[in-house]
Amino acid sequence: MKKLIVIDACMRDGESRTRRILNPLLEKLAERYEIETIRLDGQDWQAVGRRVLAERAAGHVPEETVAMARRIAAADRLVIAAPFWDMSFPAVLKVFIENMSLFNITFRDNGTSFEGLCRCERLLYVTTRGMNLRTGDPLETVTPYLRALSLLWGLGEVITVAAENLDYSSPSEIDARIDAAVAEGLAICREF
């Protein structure tokens, strides 16, 4: 069975609108994939700063970080779930990505260019946006970032499933937008 890794950066437990989209998609994907979920909560990973860079330069990267990066590099598919926060996504996701961006594990370079080392063929990004921003809007910065990361790591095609304008909608409109995103996501999951 192929391997799928889910990076869940949804910060609200019971009330996460993003997770309301994610969960039915994972049920569908579980029919074809062995799924490992990495749930970020802000306490797991330290920002990559001077100390971490000095440790890496000295050849020290914590074994758990290396093991996690190797699992991500070996995954056939990747799903990232995160709400739209402050024109991006929760900082914990960026910190996690920086920790997983390990030379000779997720990417390498030859002095003139880089090469992604991940075997992933597709990345599915699941999100909810309070604002009325569609994927591709100049203010929606996450999809372009994930496409750039995909080039660096070798993650393949980036597909975004989003429900928008949720902060300015009635409860019934929110439900309808989330239901539409779930339907779109389930259609994508058939071929993902």
Regions found by a protein language model. Give the residues of each.
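N-terminal beta1-alpha1-beta2 submodule of the flavodoxin-like/Rossmannoid cofactor-binding fold
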Residues: 1-102, 183-192
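A short, flexible beta-alpha/helix-coil linker loop
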Residues: 10-12, 129-133, 165-169
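Hydrophobic residues at beta-strand termini and immediately following loops
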Residues: 38, 126, 161
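Structured loop/turn residues at beta-strand edges in well-structured enzyme cores
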Residues: 73, 91, 118, 153-156
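Conserved nucleotide-sugar donor-interacting segment of glycosyltransferase catalytic cores
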Residues: 100-112
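Short, glycine-/small-residue-rich phosphate/pyrophosphate-handling segment
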Residues: 109-153
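Glycine-rich phosphate/pyrophosphate-binding loop and the adjoining helix
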Residues: 135-136, 140-192
